[in-house]
Amino acid sequence: MPWRAQDHSVDCLTRSEVYALWAEAVNTLKRNLQVKNVSAHLLEDDAADVKDYIRANLSRFTVITGKCSRRTVCHHHRRVQRTLEPRQDLVNEYACSVTDVYRSPKWSICPTTCTRSRSPTTTPR
């Protein structure tokens, strides 16, 4: 077995699992009556208190799923950091990751007329 799989330090923690970790951290903070900025969204500046709580308690968190039985979150600190502090907006991050995988995007970006009108664009028949 490769050494990275043995020490459970591979980046197998998904974005959904990090978001679930976020939700559990918010619930724990609420349960302990530490409610400062717990309603802030992950991408807002006010979310720093929840992010600090997660960073401070990484060694206590575990994720249990079928793909990895002993995933302590502290081994995935790079993945957690990338998710909590994105360097770009999610649309551009997705475009970059899909382009890296497929070498060219498999979808078309919505034209500017769509963003102004807030209605889906349709192709003429």
UniProtKB/Swiss-Prot annotation:
Give the Pfam families listed for this entry.
Baculo_LEF-11
UniProt entry keywords in alphabetical sequence: Transcription, Transcription regulation
SS bonds (residue pairs): none
Q: Which GO terms describe its biological process?
A: regulation of DNA-templated transcription; viral life cycle
InterPro entries linked = Baculo_LEF-11 (IPR009429)
The yes or no answer to whether the keyword Transmembrane helix is present is no
Q: What does this protein do?
A: Involved in late/very late gene activation.
The UniProt entry's sequence similarity note says:
Belongs to the baculoviridae LEF-11 family.
Q: What is this protein called?
A: Late expression factor 11
Q: Which organism is it from?
A: Orgyia pseudotsugata multicapsid polyhedrosis virus
